[in-house]
Amino acid sequence: MPKAFSKNKLETDMQVYDYALNLLTFRDYSASDMLLKLERKGAEKLFAEKAVAKLKEYDFINEKRYAQRVYEAWLSKKYYGRQHLEAELHKKHVLEEYIPLIMESFTEEEEAARAELACQQFLQKNARKLNQVDQKLQAAGVRFMAARGFSGRQAYIILDKLRECNAD
């Protein structure tokens, strides 16, 4: 970060706006995250709100675009399901009005494919235990899927795979 922003408190509305622009060169922020970041840096609430309003006016902060970018970043995580996506959207302070839109774009087929990948990962990690499939391993498989945000329906994929391995 430039030295002008490193230790100095933000005392004018222009300094606050410049600092906010500087932050946006690194990544997107939601309006609430930007306000919080500016206030933590020492900006007065009024200056921070003015800066965020100006950034919104010039479309530097766009909540819909931010929601889409959070979703795109989440898609790179291959082993997670629908519930994890929803939790991630809330954690990143995506506006409530955009969460259903993002959730709609994540299809059942995509979730099933991700569940399959997660199942393969679990089977690889537990390859030496597969010859003795028991309730403990099945429970571990279901916990593995649940921890990654998959529903019970998706967790059955791993149980079926474990039964297949036991039948072989």
Language-model segment annotations:
Residues 1-168:
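An alpha-helical, amphipathic repeat domain used for nucleic-acid recognition
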